[in-house]
Curated annotation (Swiss-Prot):
HAMAP family: Bpt
Major location category of this protein: cytoplasm
Keywords for the protein's UniProt record, in alphabetical order: Acyltransferase, Cytoplasm, Transferase
Highest taxon of source: Bacteria
Cellular-component GO terms for this entry: cytoplasm
An example Gene Ontology biological process: ubiquitin-dependent protein catabolic process via the N-end rule pathway
Places the protein is found: Cytoplasm
Catalytic activity: N-terminal L-glutamyl-[protein] + L-leucyl-tRNA(Leu) = N-terminal L-leucyl-L-glutamyl-[protein] + tRNA(Leu) + H(+); N-terminal L-aspartyl-[protein] + L-leucyl-tRNA(Leu) = N-terminal L-leucyl-L-aspartyl-[protein] + tRNA(Leu) + H(+)
Enzyme Commission number(s): 2.3.2.29
InterPro entries in the record: Acyl_CoA_acyltransferase, Asp_Glu_LeuTrfase, N-end_Aminoacyl_Trfase, N-end_Aminoacyl_Trfase_C, N-end_Aminoacyl_Trfase_N
Family per record: Belongs to the R-transferase family. Bpt subfamily.
Gene expressing this chain: bpt
Name of the featured protein: Aspartate/glutamate leucyltransferase
Pfam families noted in UniProt: ATE_C, ATE_N
Organism: Helicobacter hepaticus (strain ATCC 51449 / 3B1)
C-alpha cells in the first residue's frame, strides 16, 4: 500500500456560499480494506484511489453520519416506493464504464448546474475511470437502474466488513417521478439488511440543508462527534434531534 498526502486549495464552499472549504487527501494505491474501514469510521470518503475529509477553518457543518441498518424501519411510503420499483431492472456488479455511463453522468450534472448552480465540466472516459472505476478492488460495486432497457441511474457503493457506504449516485431527471435518489438509498439499506450489515454511511450531512439535509430522513443514525486523526479513536453518538 502506497500513500501520498496532500491538501486541496482553499475555495468557496460548494454548499455554503459564505464559507470556504479545504480538504485533506490521501492518494492510496492498493488500499487494504481494514485501512479504508478505519478511514471511513473517522469521517473519510472515497473517489477512486483518492480518500478525503473536510478540514475547513472554523466550520464543522459537514457531519459524518451512519444509519443503524438493523434498527431502520421501512415506512409505508418506503415500501410503496420499493414495490413501484419492481418495474425497474436493477443490477449489482463491479464498477464499469460505458458510453451510457458517460452520457448519463454529464446529463445529470448539466441539470444540476441549471437547477442548483453546481460547477459543470463534462467528464471524459479517463476522468470517470479515475474517479469511479479505479480503486474499487474487492469492496466496490455499482448498482445500475434500467427502465425499458435504458440506463437511468448509477449508484456507486462500497461494502466493508459490517458496513455499506454510498460513494456517489447520478440519474436521469426525466425519470425523477420514480424518486430514484431515495430508491437508491433504500436499496442500499435493504442490501445491508439482507447481508447482516450494521451501518449505512450516506456521506456528509448538513442539517436542514437544501441539498444535503435529506440524509436526516433515514433514521436512526449516529453522528461522528470528533475529528479524529488516522490513529485516534472516533467517537460516535446517537443523534436525537
Amino acid at each position: 500500500m502506497r500513500l501520498v498526502e496532500f491538501y486541496s486549495e482553499k475555495k468557496v464552499c460548494s454548499y455554503i456560499d459564505s464559507k470556504q472549504s479545504i480538504f485533506r487527501y490521501f492518494h492510496i494505491q492498493n488500499v487494504t480494506p481494514s485501512f479504508y474501514y478505519g478511514l471511513l469510521e473517522r469521517g473519510w470518503r472515497r473517489f477512486g484511489n483518492y480518500f478525503f475529509t473536510p478540514m475547513c477553518e472554523g466550520c464543522t457543518d459537514c457531519i459524518s453520519i451512519r444509519t443503524l441498518i438493523d434498527d431502520f424501519t421501512f415506512s409505508r411510503n418506503h415500501k410503496r416506493l420499493l414495490k413501484k420499483a419492481q418495474n425497474i431492472d436493477i443490477y449489482i456488479q463491479k464498477p464499469t464504464i460505458t458510453q451510457a455511463h458517460i452520457e448519463l453522468y454529464n446529463r445529470y450534472h448539466r441539470v444540476m448546474r441549471d437547477k442548483k448552480g453546481w460547477e459543470y465540466t463534462p467528464t471524459t472516459p479517463e476522468s470517470y475511470m479515475d474517479m469511479f472505476v479505479e480503486g474499487h478492488q474487492d469492496f466496490g460495486y455499482e448498482i445500475l437502474y434500467f427502465i425499458d432497457s435504458q440506463l437511468v441511474g448509477v449508484g456507486l457503493v462500497d461494502a466493508l466488513f459490517d458496513s455499506i457506504t454510498a460513494v456517489y449516485f447520478y440519474y436521469d431527471h426525466t425519470f425523477a417521478h420514480h424518486s430514484l435518489g431515495t430508491l437508491n438509498i433504500l436499496k442500499q439499506i435493504q442490501i445491508g439488511k439482507e447481508n447482516g450489515l450494521k451501518y449505512f454511511y450516506p456521506g456528509y450531512w448538513i442539517k436542514d440543508h437544501y441539498c444535503m439535509g435529506y440524509k436526516q430522513r433515514f433514521t436512526p443514525f449516529e453522528v461522528l462527534k470528533n475529528i479524529p486523526d488516522v490513529f485516534e479513536a472516533p467517537i460516535w453518538e446517537m443523534y436525537n434531534g
